[in-house]
Design a protein with these regions (language model features):
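Class II aminoacyl-tRNA synthetase catalytic cores and aaRS-like
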Residues: 1-172
Length: 172
């Protein structure tokens, strides 16, 4: 086992035993380890550490590898749990989930700068909010909600503001 390295493919042989402390009540007691393949070169990031001590640029350049790190994956699990709780609560209260367009010909509400783009050689913008569509759909379904990306083309003086984020919107 001491010769094992990250990204190796192995076959484990052993016996399955009941163990109440194990996550699913069982554990494999290994009697043999066979290395099936080794990586051609070491991974560019040490994914076995709790925290990736590297730059954002390196994390993005090696994103498929960085996401194998437990802390990097945890960010997605937290987002998923928040969105699921929001959805579950609103479903329980009789809301209908809608999915609004994210590309439009113009902005639906004022006040926010828009990301402009060319869409099949015509000017378009990314959605800054689902508000216009929610107000239209509430007349149909009475209670509506959406979880989805929104885009704001605004410069910020801090690193804590995002130009794209997941919006949790409801209307009744």
């Amino acid at each position: 086992i001491h010769d094992l390295k990250e990204a190796m493919c192995v076959r484990l042989t052993g016996t399955l035993h009941e163990e109440e402390r194990a996550p699913h009540g069982r554990e494999l007691r290994i009697s043999h380890v066979e290395i099936l393949s080794s990586p051609a070169e070491p991974l560019p990031l040490a994914i076995d550490k709790w925290k990736l001590n590297t730059s954002l640029e390196a994390k993005l350049n090696y994103r498929p590898i960085a996401l194998r790190n437990v802390q990097e994956r945890a960010k997605f699990k937290i987002q998923e749990a928040l969105v699921r709780a929001f959805r579950d609560y609103l479903y329980e209260k009789g809301f209908t989930e809608i999915h609004t367009p994210k590309i439009g010909a113009r902005g639906a509400e004022g006040g926010a700068n828009l990301f402009k783009l060319s869409y099949f050689h015509k000017p378009a913008v990314l959605a800054q909010s689902p508000q216009f569509y929610k107000q239209m759909m509430v007349g149909v379904f009475d209670r509506v909600f959406e979880t989805g990306p929104v885009f704001r083309a605004e410069k910020h003086n801090t690193k804590r503001h995002l130009n794209e984020y997941t919006s949790l919107d409801f209307e009744m």
